Amino acid sequence: RYVFDKDIRKQNLLDSDFHNKQLDKPIEIIVTIDIINVADSDCQKLRAQLKGALLSEHNKVYIKFFAEYNKTEMLALPILSWGGDINHLQEMKQRGYLYEIDYIFNVIYIDSYVNLYSLFKKNVSQLVKNEKDEDKGILTKIQNTVDDLNDHIASLSGIKEFENKLTPEYQKFRDEGISVSIKSEIAVKGLYSNIIPYIKQDNDDNLYPTAGEGRKKLLTYSIYDILSDENAEKKINLFLIEEPENHLHKSMQIALSQILFTDTKYTYLFVTTHSPFVLYEMDNVNLVRIYSDRKINGISAFYKVPENYEKARKMLNRCLSEAIFANKVLLVEGPSEYMLFSKVLAIVHQFYEADGIYILPVDGIGFQMYISILDKLEIFNVIKTDNDLRAVKGKGTYSVLGFSRCNKYIGKELLPTEQIQENSISAKRALYNANIKNLDKIRSEHSVFLSKVDLENDLDEVMHDRLLTLLGETSPVDYLQDSKHYHMVELIEKLSDTDCRTIYNHYNFACLKEVAE
């Protein structure tokens, strides 16, 4: 906002604007803008305004904000410069508190608690324009009506009585042959001073006040949209939106997300949010994670939905948008793991979600997409994956898919990848036990936890007799793997607190301790 927003910049900078009040260190911000596309209208606007500061071969514009604290004046005055060569920038010309940049960029700052009525009244002259010929006649009628209204008000008995009382009181101080007259001055210039937006239901002539805060918020965005259109031809609109989720329920936040990230009007958009729902439709965005502790630097990562994930975009974004607000993320195979682990953590670590722990099922997406973003944002993540085998076509052998997956996640070939001859529970256990030393090393150094077999078989190893009792089935594994979702729900409803602690403390499910402790 200091770089682009004239309303903020004209306030200058105080000592509190300097990090930790280090007043001996000047503030310097450099914004780089790519203008390589000469056919783009926004690039053309910049090139036209920069003139001599930009040569034809320059493909980037550098905008520099510099402010040095003056201890005598007790403030810092901003200096803005720009150009196509970072080492030879020209200082911007200034007219009053406006810089050259203010004639190109139009900053639309939308506060999280913006007042609808104040916004409407402030901009009503821009929003409501009477430019048609027939409006002239209507305005004349309104003026005549206002004159009649003023005359009627002045003729009220209460007004006359007040005049009769006030005149002699005034004449006590100065008798100069005058009288006091009370007149109404309702004028056409205040034509819009009392108009208010109302919600009107289709097929219903009744008007409803826009009392709901969510409704007001949506009307506010609608007004800002109209105002931005007024400047779109002449200026580049920058939308700066603070916490748009306030007063909007989940479905409206998701609807707003679709508008913000798909409407070309919001090409240049900066959003601060605490809500994952606002990010559901994100694509081609730079995610910046701001920490609550005293870290100087935030963490950022560019995120684009890969082409092969476009069909699963909503699923990918939904889980990712929630994960990036967490401090720790446990990535699991699917809904069965999610349900079981949520149950266990809710018992052992009751407020795990409030403590920033999130369980993310990667079903249909895979681990890698999530891991890459979480790692870039420095969000601690734990992986729990199955010891899968896959038949090699025409060979009668099986590739060790689970081992290959682990090698991929840790970035080195620590586990053997030779094909094996058998696909069975015992073969998977034997493969695991033969490599347990390296698997434990991968656990401790990379937080990647491979199942001995899979969720159901590993759980059966932990509490076989207890599963027999709870499920009343001779083969708990087969039962849980048949109608997996339904039967897992049945199981977790029957698990006791003791059962949950048994699972939590067992080697097979050490991933839970890893993420919780």
Residue ranges of predicted features:
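Conserved catalytic network of the ASCE P-loop NTPase/AAA+ motor domain
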Residues: 20-25, 54-58, 69-71, 99-103, ...
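Switch/communication elements of ASCE P-loop NTPase nucleotide-binding domains
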Residues: 1-5, 192, 197-320, 338-339, ...
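Flexible phosphate/Mg2+-sensing switch loops adjacent to catalytic phosphate-binding sites
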Residues: 5-26, 295, 354-355
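Acidic, Mg2+-coordinating catalytic modules of nucleic-acid enzymes
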Residues: 319-329, 338-517
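Glycine-rich phosphate-binding loops of NTPases
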Residues: 10-22, 37-143, 403-437
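Extended helical coiled-coil dimerization/tether regions that scaffold
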Residues: 125-237, 392-396
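Short glycine-/polar-rich loops that comprise or flank the Walker A/P-loop
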Residues: 25-29, 58-63, 103-107, 283-286, ...
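Hydrophobic positions in the central parallel beta-sheet of the AAA+
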Residues: 108, 239-241, 330
